[in-house]
UniProtKB/Swiss-Prot annotation:
This is Putative membrane protein insertion efficiency factor. NCBIfam families: membrane protein insertion efficiency factor YidD. It is a peripheral membrane protein. HAMAP family: UPF0161_YidD. Disulfide bonds: none annotated. The keyword Lyase does not apply. It is found in: Cell inner membrane. Belongs to the UPF0161 family. It comes from Endomicrobium trichonymphae. Keywords: Cell inner membrane, Cell membrane, Membrane. The keyword Membrane applies. GO terms for cellular component: plasma membrane. InterPro entries: Membr_insert_effic_factor_YidD (IPR002696). Could be involved in insertion of integral membrane proteins into the membrane.
Amino acid sequence: MKQIALFLIKCYKFISQFLPSICRFQPSCSTYAYQAIETYGFFKGSLLTFKRIIRCRPFCAGGFDPVPLPKKKI
């Protein structure tokens, strides 16, 4: 599922380069989704992406919001 999701995000990113950019955050929501799924896997990455998209609304200030770094196991 992870590879399918990453492929679909790549397809979306290719198509979206021809559309005006509207994301309020850096990195963009699609880049965030790709990084989150690549780092945490399909399920946790999708949950992080969902939370990010919920925050991306018209009256949100936006700004720099990277994917959280994984916690190191001791």
